[in-house]
Swiss-Prot record:
<dbReference type="GO" id="GO:0000184">
    <property type="term" value="P:nuclear-transcribed mRNA catabolic process, nonsense-mediated decay"/>
</dbReference>
<dbReference type="InterPro" id="IPR001040">
    <property type="entry name" value="TIF_eIF_4E"/>
</dbReference>
<protein>
    <recommendedName>
        <fullName>Eukaryotic translation initiation factor 4E-1</fullName>
    </recommendedName>
</protein>
<dbReference type="Pfam" id="PF01652">
    <property type="entry name" value="IF4E"/>
</dbReference>
<dbReference type="GO" id="GO:0002183">
    <property type="term" value="P:cytoplasmic translational initiation"/>
</dbReference>
<feature type="region of interest" description="Disordered">
    <location>
        <begin position="1"/>
        <end position="20"/>
    </location>
</feature>
<dbReference type="InterPro" id="IPR023398">
    <property type="entry name" value="TIF_eIF4e-like"/>
</dbReference>
<dbReference type="GO" id="GO:0016281">
    <property type="term" value="C:eukaryotic translation initiation factor 4F complex"/>
</dbReference>
<comment type="similarity">
    <text>Belongs to the eukaryotic initiation factor 4E family.</text>
</comment>
<dbReference type="GO" id="GO:0006417">
    <property type="term" value="P:regulation of translation"/>
</dbReference>
<dbReference type="GO" id="GO:0005829">
    <property type="term" value="C:cytosol"/>
</dbReference>
<comment type="function">
    <text>Recognizes and binds the 7-methylguanosine-containing mRNA cap during an early step in the initiation of protein synthesis and facilitates ribosome binding by inducing the unwinding of the mRNAs secondary structures.</text>
</comment>
<feature type="compositionally biased region" description="Polar residues">
    <location>
        <begin position="206"/>
        <end position="218"/>
    </location>
</feature>
<keyword id="KW-0648">Protein biosynthesis</keyword>
<comment type="subunit">
    <text>eIF4F is a multi-subunit complex, the composition of which varies with external and internal environmental conditions. It is composed of at least eIF4A, eIF4E and eIF4G. eIF4E is also known to interact with other partners.</text>
</comment>
<dbReference type="InterPro" id="IPR019770">
    <property type="entry name" value="TIF_eIF_4E_CS"/>
</dbReference>
<dbReference type="GO" id="GO:0006413">
    <property type="term" value="P:translational initiation"/>
</dbReference>
Length: 218
């Protein structure tokens, strides 16, 4: 007497087919052909400030380059722009929250200030590394314990020196601002002997210089 054999379990029921396995690729698996994105908490915009150009006002020199909202998009941008250490004299890179211009007069910045670290020379690879870690800390939301204060980060390339800065929304919330300054200094991996300083945009605007009086230091 023949007995009926139970149906064989399909080998595909509990396994993922090869095409499916290859369907989801992150930037960590394939730096070129990734298709799975890791979203950021908010969109960010890359700005480039051109060196002074005859016939152009200052705000016309500030160029909105691109807005992005994922880790993968950031790396795509970072890997296709010139390093910070090669910026022309009197030019800047800025990464700011979408909708915020890297200007003192912007409504999101006018009552705020900035933490800044300044050093001689062009910085080379060390500067590029500090700038990258600063940008990653900003867009990764690890500089700001509240998630509300940090508006953006800036690298200024000037004759004989460079400046890295974190711009904040306010200038009076001392406890939070000191925490941001402490974290910024840690991100830069500075020794205790080095100091970073906080100044208010209002003071800079009145003096007509980015080197306004220091309100706090770490």
């Amino acid at each position: 007497m023949q007995t009926e054999q139970p149906p064989k379990e399909s080998q595909t029921e509990n396994t993922v087919s090869e095409p499916q396995e290859k369907a989801l690729r992150t930037v960590f698996d394939d730096k070129i052909n990734f298709n799975l994105k890791h979203p950021l908490a908010r969109p960010w915009t890359l700005w480039f400030l051109m060196p002074p150009t005859p016939g152009l006002e200052w705000n016309e020199l500030q160029k909105n380059i691109i807005t992005f909202n994922s880790v993968e998009e950031f790396w795509g941008i970072h890997n296709n722009i010139n390093p910070a250490s090669s910026l022309p004299i009197k030019s800047d890179y800025s990464f700011f929250r979408e909708g915020v211009r890297p200007e003192w007069e912007d409504v999101h910045n006018k009552t705020g200030g900035k933490w800044a670290f300044q050093n001689k020379g062009r910085g080379g690879n060390a500067l590029d590394e500090m700038w990258l870690t600063t940008v990653l800390a900003a867009i990764g939301e690890t500089l700001d314990p509240t998630g509300q204060e940090v508006m953006g980060v800036v690298i200024n390339m000037r004759k004989g020196f460079y400046r890295l800065a974190v711009w904040t929304k306010s200038c009076n919330n001392r406890e939070v601002l000191m925490e941001i300054g402490t974290r910024f200094k840690q991100v830069l991996n500075l020794p205790r002997s080095e100091t970073i300083e906080f100044s208010a945009h209002e003071d800079s605007s009145k003096s007509g210089s980015t080197r306004a009086k220091t309100r706090m230091s770490v």
